[in-house]
Amino acid sequence: MNIPTFAAIKQQIHKHIFYMRLNNIKKVFLASSALLSAMSMSAAERFVSFKQGDLLINGNDKVEIYMDANDCRGVSYAANALVRDISKVSGSQATITSNRKATILVGTIGHSAAIDQLIKQKRINGNLLKGKREKFIITVVDKQLVIAGSDRRGTIYGIYELSQQMGVSPWYDWADVPVEHHDSIFVNKGIYTDGEPAVRYRGIFLNDEAPCLTSWVKNTYGTEYGDHRFYQRVFELVLRLRGNMMWPAMWGWAFYADDAENEKTADEMGVVMSTSHHEPMARNHQEYARNRKGWGPWNYQKNKANLQKFFREGIERMKGTEQIVTIGMRGDGDEAMSEEADTRLMTNIINDQR
């Protein structure tokens, strides 16, 4: 009989529950089961050690991290998180640098000249990454730790794999998991990789957010809605857990309309946004509810032109971003559709939306 370790039990608990800090009292709210289906906490073999290894990455208490200025914005978010993580773990001063000979090199094929050059020189095996989805390799080349991704999320996952193996839990923020302290951080030679994920889209839905989460956000950020500062912290958690998708809170909040930076931040960080329930076509219901008089009744048979305009604006707004569009229609505020609604009407709605 295999008895699970305490760490394994804790990992499963953390996958199910977000712990929220509200007035110094722990509050909890349950995440959607979508979080659980395929988020791997760590899949690559162990390559970090703290006593000895092939490469000491924080020698002289300084760590330089190189990334191409032309790499994806999400890689920059993750690289800067790595700077903070190294400082938390070891106390060493970490910085982003333009020096290609930095201790750590992170980059995405096709977006990082340094990574592309290493592949061309056959210093790293590009066949492990080319044409792959959300895959990374971590290896030592000469005296440099290289983290290369097949795409932006592959690179991001590789960066956060290093953070986790150093001792930074994905839940360091939302569950107050203590960060480990180590004076020295070594990495061992080898090729460490993970991906492609078996499930293409993996994420969470912020469900039943009031009053706990909404109160915490108001007390923390002074807003009546989740702005990009709040969502950036949630997006980071999703990515550290190898997720890539999110459905935002919807009761009284409007993700797209409350803060224009919300959609931009999600796309920059590499999180695919979507909507659910009664929010089709990348529109939040609050965008309609706050102006019912202007939009008219939520009834496709009686108000088709205005609702088509409402839907069209959502699609136009999301242009150039990576999102999943929900189609169909439910009743106003997630109520039942009108009595005259039938499958033929729903078919027409979906055909029009397409």
Residue ranges and their predicted role:
Residues 257-260, 267-268, 295-354:
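Gly/Pro-rich turn-and-neighbor structural signature
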Residues 174-224, 229-249:
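An acidic-aromatic substrate-binding cleft motif
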Residues 253-277:
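Aromatic-lined substrate-binding rim segments of carbohydrate-active enzymes
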Residues 44-196:
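Contiguous, structured surface segment used for ligand recognition
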Residues 148-149, 210-227, 244-253, 291-306, ...:
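The substrate-binding groove and active-site-proximal loops of carbohydrate-active enzymes
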Residues 198-213, 235-250, 272-296, 318-337:
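Core alpha/beta catalytic barrel or barrel-like domain that forms the active/cofactor pocket
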Residues 1-47:
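Bacterial Sec-dependent N-terminal signal peptides
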Residues 74-77, 81, 85, 154-161, ...:
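Extracytoplasmic/secreted proteins, especially bacterial periplasmic and envelope-associated proteins
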